Amino acid sequence: MSASTTATLRHDWTLAEVKALFVQPFNDLLFQAQTVHRAHFDANRVQVSTLLSIKTGACPEDCKYCPQSGHYNTGLEKEKLMEVQKVLEEAARAKAIGSTRFCMGAAWKHPSAKDMPYVLKMVEGVKAMGLETCMTLGRLDQDQTEALAKAGLDYYNHNLDTSPEFYGSIITTRTYAERLQTLAYVRDAGMKICSGGILGMGESLDDRANLLIQLANLPEHPESVPINMLVKVAGTPLENADDVDPFDFIRMLAVARILMPQSHVRLSAGREAMNEQMQALAFFAGANSIFYGDKLLTTANPQADKDMQLFARLGIQPEAREEHADEVHQAAIEQALVEQKSSEQFYNAAV
């Protein structure tokens, strides 16, 4: 199968086709992925995002990989919903170190009615700084997606995690169909989709292929596809899972690039365990987005200065961002404070 034929957008991939991509010689796969990548992106630019946990721990879901699940004793301290001012201060810091997108994550099964007004103000404030906005809040209903879109949310993250066949071995508190329904609501509301999965949970090659097929065969490809390598956390059921072979991880990125040629493929969780050579291979395979900063929700991430040093050595530049003066950042923070104090719909999230 030539690179030129896979550079077109398809939504009808079969398991046989995708497995054939996975098992071809490594150099052939990377050549094909890089060729597709260059047809749609500047191969020497990477989109940079920062992820902030706005509500940590005590999640009612039982995802076996997650240290935030209330089902497991991981030593993670529960934190309540962060206040708007603090979120906007963190967003300003993220932009100052080069992020173009600010992602906010809450450890919920779904956001409650009392939380939504607060979350919407976060979106509005971050958007006012000129940053792209992204949130991951769990399952959404149609009204919630429409409210987030109206507030200016650009991306909603809702990962499929793995294949439909393997999913029940990892999560029992939310169905695969519910995840797909949330993605449909997000798309119908006019927002962009961020959705991917995790390697290293005991899944098979078929499972990895079927995860990518689920994503690539959606009516529209996700604009962002995060590929995570399991971060093994003591206290979770997967703390002793086998390591992912580095070449298998690179193959996953390359096949994702070929199947979804116009999507940003994000090198996401697990990057702390990757050496510079593996990260360089990931970029060559078509990864063109990273999370930037010292922490990814609750697990370590390479330090920001190390990322910039690696970019410099590889000749990679962060994607361009919209510039706003410091006064705009401060005005957004101050406006959020005024609205929070004057509106009776807000509650003290620190209590």
From Swiss-Prot:
<keyword id="KW-0479">Metal-binding</keyword>
<feature type="binding site">
    <location>
        <position position="103"/>
    </location>
    <ligand>
        <name>[2Fe-2S] cluster</name>
    </ligand>
</feature>
<comment type="similarity">
    <text>Belongs to the radical SAM superfamily. Biotin synthase family.</text>
</comment>
<comment type="pathway">
    <text>Cofactor biosynthesis; biotin biosynthesis; biotin from 7,8-diaminononanoate: step 2/2.</text>
</comment>
<comment type="subunit">
    <text>Homodimer.</text>
</comment>
<dbReference type="InterPro" id="IPR013785">
    <property type="entry name" value="Aldolase_TIM"/>
</dbReference>
<dbReference type="InterPro" id="IPR007197">
    <property type="entry name" value="rSAM"/>
</dbReference>
<keyword id="KW-0408">Iron</keyword>
<keyword id="KW-0001">2Fe-2S</keyword>
<feature type="binding site">
    <location>
        <position position="266"/>
    </location>
    <ligand>
        <name>[2Fe-2S] cluster</name>
    </ligand>
</feature>
<dbReference type="GO" id="GO:0005506">
    <property type="term" value="F:iron ion binding"/>
</dbReference>
<comment type="function">
    <text>Catalyzes the conversion of dethiobiotin (DTB) to biotin by the insertion of a sulfur atom into dethiobiotin via a radical-based mechanism.</text>
</comment>
<dbReference type="InterPro" id="IPR010722">
    <property type="entry name" value="BATS_dom"/>
</dbReference>
<feature type="binding site">
    <location>
        <position position="59"/>
    </location>
    <ligand>
        <name>[4Fe-4S] cluster</name>
    </ligand>
</feature>
<dbReference type="Pfam" id="PF04055">
    <property type="entry name" value="Radical_SAM"/>
</dbReference>
<dbReference type="InterPro" id="IPR002684">
    <property type="entry name" value="Biotin_synth/BioAB"/>
</dbReference>
<keyword id="KW-0411">Iron-sulfur</keyword>
<protein>
    <recommendedName>
        <fullName>Biotin synthase</fullName>
        <ecNumber>2.8.1.6</ecNumber>
    </recommendedName>
</protein>
<feature type="binding site">
    <location>
        <position position="63"/>
    </location>
    <ligand>
        <name>[4Fe-4S] cluster</name>
    </ligand>
</feature>
<dbReference type="GO" id="GO:0051539">
    <property type="term" value="F:4 iron, 4 sulfur cluster binding"/>
</dbReference>
<dbReference type="InterPro" id="IPR024177">
    <property type="entry name" value="Biotin_synthase"/>
</dbReference>
<dbReference type="InterPro" id="IPR006638">
    <property type="entry name" value="Elp3/MiaA/NifB-like_rSAM"/>
</dbReference>
<feature type="binding site">
    <location>
        <position position="194"/>
    </location>
    <ligand>
        <name>[2Fe-2S] cluster</name>
    </ligand>
</feature>
<feature type="domain" description="Radical SAM core">
    <location>
        <begin position="44"/>
        <end position="262"/>
    </location>
</feature>
<keyword id="KW-0093">Biotin biosynthesis</keyword>
<dbReference type="Pfam" id="PF06968">
    <property type="entry name" value="BATS"/>
</dbReference>
<dbReference type="GO" id="GO:0051537">
    <property type="term" value="F:2 iron, 2 sulfur cluster binding"/>
</dbReference>
<keyword id="KW-0949">S-adenosyl-L-methionine</keyword>
<keyword id="KW-0004">4Fe-4S</keyword>
<keyword id="KW-0808">Transferase</keyword>
<feature type="binding site">
    <location>
        <position position="66"/>
    </location>
    <ligand>
        <name>[4Fe-4S] cluster</name>
    </ligand>
</feature>
<dbReference type="GO" id="GO:0004076">
    <property type="term" value="F:biotin synthase activity"/>
</dbReference>
<feature type="binding site">
    <location>
        <position position="134"/>
    </location>
    <ligand>
        <name>[2Fe-2S] cluster</name>
    </ligand>
</feature>
<dbReference type="GO" id="GO:0009102">
    <property type="term" value="P:biotin biosynthetic process"/>
</dbReference>
